[in-house]
A protein has these predicted regions:
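Cytoplasmic helix-loop-helix junction between adjacent transmembrane helices
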Residues: 108-148
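Helix-to-loop junctions at the C-terminal end of transmembrane segments
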Residues: 66-78, 270-284
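Juxtamembrane intracellular "pre-TM" segments in multi-pass secondary transporters
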Residues: 2-10, 189-226, 248, 415
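A membrane-interface helix-boundary motif in multi-pass transporters
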Residues: 162-175, 365-391
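Short amphipathic helix-loop junctions that connect adjacent transmembrane helices
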Residues: 32-49, 239-256
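C-terminal transmembrane helical hairpin of 12-TM major facilitator-type secondary transporters
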Residues: 285-328
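Conserved MFS/SLC helix-loop-helix module at the cytosolic interface between two early adjacent transmembrane helices
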Residues: 64-103
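Helix-breaking motifs and short loop linkers at transmembrane-helix boundaries and internal kinks
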Residues: 78, 99-104, 116, 250, ...
Length: 415
């Protein structure tokens, strides 16, 4: 079953969206409760913050080395088998996490899970396979919206289940991952025809080499830096949100589940519906510029918020920020040839994984420095102030890059 005809490509899009939805629901389920689960093995808030950073770091470093390998394998053998491997890996990791008897077991499980988890990168390659260059920004937006819907349903469900038992969300997430495996086996078509596959090379699966190749793509070098800064800010948010809101507002799994529900809802609304309208009136470059400014202001306001309800208000302020990732992905994908989409998106995933490695060190590290301060203290927002700075620097780089590209294009036209 393949998606290498126009009708097949059109029909394949709903299949991959359903796959991503179930995948992200399962991941989203554990977000509100994983820090609390780590806390059951530690004796203080400071230790909990530190070890949650270690658990997140372990997943990220394994994913950094695993993503380009799995991306290159998907260029060789097709997207479908690599996605199925990722679903099986997720199911194993969720069940093993729920049953972990000690902290070192939890760390080991996250290491294996990170090495096998490249579903996001392969899904992006899948969408690139079945889309024309003109369709990619909109379809990456739909993919981002599906991620958002998964994070609507996942965290709020995980928060409610976590109130019953901390381990219950992990069992439910494992069940969803198994369901996704069955869906992939019986329903999901292959998107990469045999004629467009390429041999596997270990050299190209090296994450450092992958990042160099990504920077070498014509016209996207500075955008890689923008993506890196944006990813570091986003993953710092992910790695500190639950701990931060607990320290500042005294929130538990239920409150964090609802707040992450709101983030996912806004992401889905913007990328699933509003982005199509925005692209009719704006270029992806303009959306990147406006989105980075919006994100910088939002991170600053999240860090400054003196009351919990304000966290919800700031989500609305970040409306344009939800368009940045899809816009950047479409520009990078359009710069790569058809036989290299898996490797290119694997390289993007490696970049994201590297930032996911650094985020717990920076976010949890900064939060550890201020965790002794009283609830509601100004300095508890330090990780978010850091994220605002990252987005501001990314905005400056993007503005300069697009201005230079415009000047170069104008000079070429005049010649």
């Amino acid at each position: 079953m393949t998606a290498d005809t126009p009708r097949g490509r059109q029909a394949a899009m709903p299949f991959i969206l359903v796959t991503v939805l179930i995948d992200m629901m399962s991941i989203g389920l554990i977000i509100p409760v994983l820090p609390a689960l780590v806390g059951t093995f530690t004796g203080s808030t400071t230790d909990q913050t530190f070890w949650f950073g270690v658990v997140s770091f372990t997943f990220g470093i394994a994913n950094f080395f695993g993503s380009p390998v799995l991306g290159a394998l998907s260029d060789r053998f097709g997207r479908r088998p690599v996605l199925l491997l990722g679903f099986c890996g997720l199911a194993f990791s969720f069940f093993a996490t729920a049953l972990a008897p000690a902290l070192w077991v939890l760390v080991a499980v996250r290491l294996v899970s990170g090495a096998l988890q490249a579903n996001a990168a392969v899904a992006q390659s899948y969408v690139a396979d079945i889309s024309t260059p003109q369709e990619r920004a909109r379809r990456f937006g739909l993919l981002g919206a599906t991620f958002g819907v998964g994070f609507i349903l996942g965290p709020v469900t995980g928060g409610l289940l976590g109130d019953i038992d901390l381990h219950l969300p992990f069992y439910v997430a494992g069940g969803l991952a198994l369901l996704n495996t069955l869906y992939g086996v019986f329903v999901l078509p292959e998107s990469l025809p045999a004629s467009k596959r390429r041999p596997f090379e270990w050299r190209r699966a090296n994450p450092v080499h992958s990042l160099r190749e990504l920077r070498a793509l014509r016209g996207v070098g500075p955008l890689v830096t923008v993506m890196a800064l944006g990813s570091l800010a986003q993953f710092t948010l992910h790695s500190t949100w639950v701990l931060y809101t607990g320290l500042k507002f005294g929130w538990g799994p239920r409150e964090n589940g609802w707040s992450l529900f709101a983030v996912g809802l806004m992401s889905a609304l913007v990328q699933g519906g509003l982005m199509r309208q925005l692209l009719k009136r704006n270029t992806p470059q303009k959306l990147v510029r406006l989105g980075l400014i919006s994100s910088a202001l939002s991170y600053l306001c999240w860090g400054l918020a003196p009351e919990g309800w304000m966290m919800y208000a700031v989500i609305g302020l970040n409306l344009l920020g939800f368009t940045v990732t899809a816009s950047l992905q479409s520009m990078v994908s359009n710069a790569a040839d058809a036989t290299s989409q898996g490797r290119t998106m694997g390289s993007v995933a490696s970049l994201n994984s590297l930032m996911a490695v650094l985020a717990p060190l920076t976010g949890a590290g900064l939060l550890t420095l201020v965790s002794h301060r009283p609830q509601g203290d100004f300095w508890i927002g330090l990780p978010f102030y850091f994220c605002a700075l990252l987005q501001a620097v990314a905005a400056v780089i993007a503005f300069r890059h697009f201005r230079q590209r415009s000047a170069t294009s104008a000079a070429s036209s005049a010649a």
